[in-house]
């Protein structure tokens, strides 16, 4: 199994909690899927906690503390504040996968906006009342496809 780790030199703007969480994740050899199952969130939401891009609930803190053997008071100190979202990646991003996601918005952003406005009227899709997931799909030729679902309240 290949596990996501953290190279802090590539992410100097992440909160202290990121180093704490990623070190424990690596020490325990846990995937985000395993962590998500333990805390009762999906794997993208769990990963967002590690990158400081989502707010941890008191229950998340207790469950992460149990799973990762991190003292609860330390996680309470590091995760109880409000996330400083959007600072973790310079723009435009240099990491190729992150750049491709950015490129999707560059290329299709106005097309998404036009279709969404036609379907829902004037407004915006929430990134607060929001969920997302990643699935793997394999076609009949054996090619793997990434399926990313974005679900936001209108």
Swiss-Prot record:
Recorded GO MF terms: cyanate hydratase activity; DNA binding
EC number: 4.2.1.104
GO biological process, one term: cyanate metabolic process
Signal peptide: none
Reactions it catalyzes: cyanate + hydrogencarbonate + 3 H(+) = NH4(+) + 2 CO2
Active-site residues, Swiss-Prot/TrEMBL: 100, 103, 126
Keywords: Lyase
SMART domains reported in the protein's UniProt record: Cyanate_lyase (SM01116)
PANTHER family referenced in this protein's UniProt entry, alphabetically: CYANATE HYDRATASE (PTHR34186:SF2)
Family: Belongs to the cyanase family.
NCBIfam families assigned to the protein according to its UniProt record, in alphabetical order: cynS
Stated role: Catalyzes the reaction of cyanate with bicarbonate to produce ammonia and carbon dioxide.
Name this polypeptide is given: Cyanate hydratase
Highest classification ranks of the organism: Eukaryota, Fungi, Dikarya, Ascomycota, Pezizomycotina
Gene (name only): cyn1
């Amino acid at each position: 199994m290949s596990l996501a780790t953290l190279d802090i030199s590539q992410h100097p703007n992440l909160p202290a909690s990121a180093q704490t969480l990623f070190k424990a994740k690596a020490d325990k050899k846990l995937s985000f899927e395993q962590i998500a199952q333990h805390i009762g969130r999906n794997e993208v939401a769990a990963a967002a906690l590690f990158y400081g891009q989502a707010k941890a609930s008191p229950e998340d803190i207790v469950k992460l503390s149990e799973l990762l053997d991190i003292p609860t008071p330390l996680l309470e100190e590091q995760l109880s504040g409000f996330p400083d979202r959007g600072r973790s990646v310079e723009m435009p991003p240099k990491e190729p996968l992150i750049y491709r996601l950015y490129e999707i918005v560059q290329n299709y952003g106005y097309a998404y906006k036009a279709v969404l406005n036609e379907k829902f009227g004037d407004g915006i899709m929430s990134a607060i009342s929001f969920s997302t997931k990643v699935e793997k799909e394999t076609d009949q030729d054996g090619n793997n496809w990434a399926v990313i679902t974005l679900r936001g309240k209108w």
